[in-house]
Each structure stands twice: as C-alpha cells, then as structure tokens.
Amino acid sequence: MATPWWTRAAIYQVYPRSFRDLNGDGTGDLRGIVSELPYIAALGVDAVWLSPFYPSPQRDSGYDVADPRAVDPIYGTIEDARELIAQAHARALRVIVDVVPNHSSSERAWFQEALRSEPGSPERARYHFLDGRGLAGDQPPTNWTSWFGGGAWTRVVELDGRPGQWYLHTFDESQPDLNWSNPEVRADGLETLRFWLDMGADGFRVDVALGLAKDMSYPDIDDPESLTLAMRMDLDDGSVDAMNRRRKVANSAVLDRDEVQDVYREWRQVMDEYDGDRMAVAEAWVPPERAARYVAPDTLHQIFNFDFMAAPWDAVRVRGVIEKTMASLSYVGAPPTWALSNHDTPRVVSRLGGGPLGLRRARAMALIAHALPGAVYVYQGEELGLSDALLPDSARQDPVFFRTGGAQLGRDGARVPVPWSGSEPPYGFSDGSLPTWLPQPTDWAAFTVEGEIADPNSALHQYRATLRLRAAHPGLVDQQAFVLPEAPEGVLVLERGAGLRCVVNFTDEAVTSPVSGRVLVASDASVMVEGDRVTLPPSTGAWLQT
Ligand code: NOJ
C-alpha cells in the first residue's frame, strides 16, 4: 500500500493577508492566491497551508476567529474558498486550512452572548469565566500569564454595570479561551472540521494544539512568567536553557495536558470517515519526550518541529536536533516535520545573522531541511530569501508589540507582503491604489519573484530544484533510507538512498567535501567541482549524486 501523501509532503504556507492582493485594498485575498497557484505548483510542493481567512476583527491577524465556518469579506467569499480548493486540486495541490480551537474572537456571537448572560449560565460555560479573588473579587482568579505578555485574565462589567467575573485569555484579551470540557464546544469543533472536510480540505493545521485542556481546579502555577518566556521564539537559541524553560510549562495546569488528546481522538475518528488521507498537523511546541502523544495512530498526524526551527548555525546542534526528532517520533511511527520559519518567527535569513551572511546560511540550511525524511514546510517568501522587514513602530499591528509596551517588537517583520515584480513597493503585490497593510522595504527589488526567476543562481531556483527533486528522486522518495554519517568538524553530511547526499559547511573556512559526486544543487554559485573534488566555501552546501 502506498504511504499517505502527508508522510513525505512539501507544504507551502500561505499567509493570506500578505500573499497577493487582487482587489487593490492593500490586503491579500483568496482570489489573489488562486491567481498565483501556478507559481506555487511550479515550486514543486504537494500542498498549501492557508493561515486563517475567517471573519475576524483582525486583532491578531485572523487568529481571532469570529466565525470558524465562513470567510472574512476582506479575503473574499465562501465561493472564493470553494474555487481556491477546486483550482488547487486541479493542479494536484492539496489544501490544509488552519483551525483555531483554543480561543475565539471576543466578537464571536458566543462570547457576546456570554457577556450578556449571568455568571454560571450555559453561555458562560463555553469559556472560562471565574469569580476573582480577594474580598471584592478584584484579583484575577489565577496567576497565569498571557503568551503575549501581561496577565491572562480580564474582568468584565456585568449587566447591572458592576465589575464582575473574569475570563481567561491565553493570548490577547480579544481572544477568550474556549472551554473544551464543554460538550457543546466539542461538538462545535467537530462541526467546523466537517464543514471544511466537506468543502474538500485535505487537512488542518491545529493552532495552539497544546492548549485546549486546562486544569479546571484553576491552581496557581510556579513561576508564572515562565509561561510567557517558554513560548518566545525570539529567546530560543536552541540551548538547554531554552528547552528547560519549555519543560517547565509542558504538562502543566495550562499547557500540554494529557486530556487534550481526548479531543484529538474524536477528531481523528471524524477525519478517518473521509476518504483521501485527510490529515492534521499540531502546532505544539513541546519537548521531544512529549511530542509522540500528538501523533499517535489515534490522535493527529504530524507535529511541528520547533526545535529544528530554533536550531542555531552549528553543525553539532543541528545534527543533535535531527537525531532527537527522529528518535522521539519513531516509536509511534509518525513522520517528522521540518520548517525553517513561519509567520510567528523571525525569517530564517534574519535569525541566522541577517544580510548576505544570513542568506548564505539560510540557503544552506534549506538544503538540509529539504533532504530530510518526513514532511517539510516552506513559509511564503522563504524561497525568495527574504529577511525580516524593519518597520516603523507606527506601522506595527501585532498585539505582542502593544501588550509588552513595545518591549518586544512582535512578528510583523516576518509578515510583510510578498514582492512579485518591479523595482518599488508594492512590487506587484497589489495595484497600489491603497497602501499595503504593512509597508514593504524599499530595497526588495532584488528579491522579487520576477527578478529571481531571471537569475539562475537565486534562492528561488534553489528551492525549485530541491523541492522538485524531493518529489522525484528515488533516494528522497524512499523514507527508510536515511543515515547521518560521521563528518569532519563543522560539516554535516546527510545520506539518503540511491546515492543522494547533502553536505553543508558550517565553518568560516572553505572545506573539501568529505563526499564527492555530481552536484545536483548548490546553495551558492561559488561551490566548486574539480574532478572528484568538491570545494565548499564558508556557509555553503550542495546536494551530490554519488
Ligand atoms: C499561533 C499562531 O500561529 C499565532 O500567529 C497566533 O498569534 C497564536 N497561535 C494565537 O492564535
């Protein structure tokens, strides 16, 4: 029996706000995505993951969902969504949609009903409403903190005008947490899954998959700041300290509780009712020893690998993450996943040093990511080698910036609209009648899709080459064939089947590759081949056919 597509897929993340704007309002839309499906298909990927496009006040760029089974007019209509799925399928691209079960928008009808209802009412029981502590109830019910900074509870004003109960929000106060111990919430979640499955969606990316279950005795936790710190990608340097910060909050009152898997067991049964190998990937940044729970045969299918995303530019550390990842998932038989960036993290070029050096490293890291067994995710613009945009504070939109009083800049720099063509903003992203929702840098002319198509040495050509080979090379198709052989210090070698090897030089000196062969793809034009000898300048790599 053929293995399901998602066990070895390449999946392209589209962030709809910033992909392509066809109606000229400065924000991307679904018809814009349809118009660029040929571009996505030409990359050689198997699927598209769409970040949320549901009705939303956009306080957290759509991760504050007011109606999980509809389309926000800024992105188009439900017919556009249907068309997008149909057109993607016509190009052999699967479609993964985002589901956001941990919380809703405060503008969802449910939350508005809860505000109009009494304490203890069924309407309030869909969320976490509690009386405050202290004689006047003016202290939050627990010491839990929000991932976005500040406290995780906000007090409401009751119908009689008096300050009343508090509600929980792990994120912004406009994102109240849903109560997943409530059967009505559970049933509604299944209805959302069925809605998109019926529409033809091939899978789901499950937002905050580790957060749905809470300890409903609502205990205080030790060191509440650790909750905020543990999830800050900008603080994670792949170190033991960073891992320990996450260990502290894993399997705690608020995160990664074992009961969360009961929800996914129900979800899995629903997905299994449908044909076509539907799948779900968990956004759950948990230590490796907790990961397998999310991808057991009766729970979800994949889990994002944030440790790989956080790995520093260091051959030993990258190797260590790869080995740990493979080991942690092997006993449940789930495929690992690999990603270098997403809409929540600094772009990989910036994370690995920025500028030309960051780009060299990022391109070499992409050779590794694309050569690994399992599934690989590519965040839009990564294939162009984009870095984070520097933005004026006045342009920022991320609630992280506002909730921390500007102490953290937030994630907007990685979310700037994609440059398609031309030499100045909006670079073909929109027709320019209205400003783009985030301003694009004025020096992106060298990074447009059009410019990179014309340059055979561009990041785009490298991504196309490796992603296409991934789909066709027998050594990459075979998921069993994978070895990490010993290599000289500062060099990483990956062996896949059928003579395919990936070699990357992490050092600041040129090295002779310990393996020779024909260069299939190089991360830089300076990689040199003389007879049997392949020379890798600093921060470069190659795929070799031996
Ligand atoms: C993770 C999403 O990727 C992020 O963008 C969002 O802010 C939080 N979850 C809350 O939904």
Where are the model-predicted features located?
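Acidic/aromatic-lined carbohydrate-recognition and catalytic surfaces
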Residues: 2-194, 198, 211-285, 418
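Loop/helix patches that line or flank the sugar-binding groove of alpha-linked glycan CAZymes
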Residues: 5-7, 217-253, 262-277, 286, ...
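Hydrophobic residues within beta-strands of alpha/beta enzymes
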Residues: 48, 204-206
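Generic enzyme active-site microenvironment
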Residues: 96-97, 205, 281, 339-340, ...
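Catalytic cores of alpha/beta
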Residues: 291
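Beta-strand-rich binding/interaction modules
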Residues: 509-525
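C-terminal beta-strand-rich structural cap/linker in extracellular carbohydrate-active enzymes
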Residues: 530-546
